[in-house]
Amino acid sequence: MSLSLHNVGWCAGGKTIVHDASYAFEAGKVTAIIGPNGAGKSTLLRLASGLLPVGGGVVHLNNVPISDLSPMYLAGGRAMLTQDSPLRARFTLRDLVAMGGQVSAPLLGASARLELAEQLLKRVGLGAFIERDIMGLSGGERQRAHLARVMMQLEAAVHGTDKSPGFLLLDEPISAQDLSRQSLVLDLVRAHARRGGGVALVIHDLNWAVACADQIVVLHDGRIYAQGPPEQVLTNALASHVFGLEEGQVHKHVATGKPYILPHNMICQ
């Protein structure tokens, strides 16, 4: 499974939001997309998903333009969690999550979808709320319920096979979570990659980005400013230029060589 952007651009309101972006997301890897507010991170992710039509260039899924793919194939190849995921008040959590597999796996029986939905709700820490209406949940619980729904979209497509799941595209998946739940969500992200699925996520906390990502893409003024492993990309020079951090806030672990930011709760928006 492969997902790649080729000279992709997007304009809105007479302003170019994403400039000529090219990048290949890798199966089995987590890619963190970081950058200051207004850099184009969410737009880039929406372009990769096909939720926004590209204003220039092309997006490929398995070397085929996504505009040429059937809805079922596209749904099974990538799934996106947006920051404004819709609420579906008339559904229980189990039914909401099960709906994630309707387009990507139309031949999967209803009972199998419901069983898989229950498993996913347990994974995101909502196993006790299977029959609950989503409107009765906190913001963090709703966010994890919708994470289970987009995971369902990919896992239903490969259910009962030895195939790897597709690409999870996650826009700020831990923004509404407390510290322990942030760790849970990012553990799920890593587990998805270990199964051979790809992950691209927009994240503001640089320390979490380094902790969970194999690759980092830095957006600045709508352009891909840097890309590569965290230890190569996240330097004091970059942090100062892109995020306005003070020189010396980026440190490196002696044992791993991975960078980290002090103070540890540094959020770069």
Residue ranges and their predicted role:
Residues 3, 18-20:
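Conserved structural motif at the start of ABC-family nucleotide-binding domains
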Residues 34-36:
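The feature captures the beta-strand-to-loop junction immediately N-terminal to the Walker
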Residues 49:
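Helix-to-loop junction immediately C-terminal to a conserved catalytic motif
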Residues 57-65:
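Conserved ABC transporter NBD signature motif
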Residues 65-79, 89, 107-114:
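ABC ATPase NBD coupling module
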Residues 111-129:
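Conserved ABC ATPase "signature" region
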Residues 236, 240-269:
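ABC ATPase nucleotide-binding domains
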